[in-house]
Amino acid sequence: MNEEKRGLCMNIRYLKNVLRKARKIDDTIQLSLNSAKWEYPEGKVHETQEERCQNVKKKLFEGWLSRDQFLKECQTIVRSQLDQDRNTSKSPLKSQQQLPSSSTTQVSERLDPYAKEVQVQLSPPEEVQIVLQSELSVEQIIRDQTWEVLTNACPGMFKDWRDTYKD
């Protein structure tokens, strides 16, 4: 994997920023469906509703495929980093080490009743892995909502996106 991709995947802020930008098509789907009616210069044939819906669906699926590939590559990078950490470290990973809160900053029990509990420290790759799992769940929610907008604008044209996306 190239270092640029690795840097994007291992930095949570960059990772979320890439996904935010890649989700623009989903965020603007209603605008895409509506504006297609008004963008044609005079004399040019307007596309039919079916053509417009198919074009939006095509762009949507291209974006989804691109995000799927990016997330899979990031998962591979994180897994390899976790494996590398496990192989190079003879001691357990940070997540397996439990640190008593007395070694950290003291917090009033009134402010945080769990301050005296044992805290778990995650390594950076483990944090990224958790974020990736969360982003995969977010993807499903976004796709459900986007597909609902598309099927409302294009009634009777499409099945469930999970069936259609596989085709």
Swiss-Prot record:
Positions with biased composition (Low complexity): 89-106
GO biological process per UniProt: protein import into mitochondrial matrix
InterPro entries in the cross-refs: MIX23
Pfam families, sorted: MIX23
Region called Disordered, residue ranges: 81-108
Entry GO terms, CC: mitochondrial intermembrane space; mitochondrion
Record family assignment: Belongs to the MIX23 family.
Name of the protein in question: Protein MIX23
Organism of derivation: Schizosaccharomyces pombe (strain 972 / ATCC 24843) (Fission yeast)
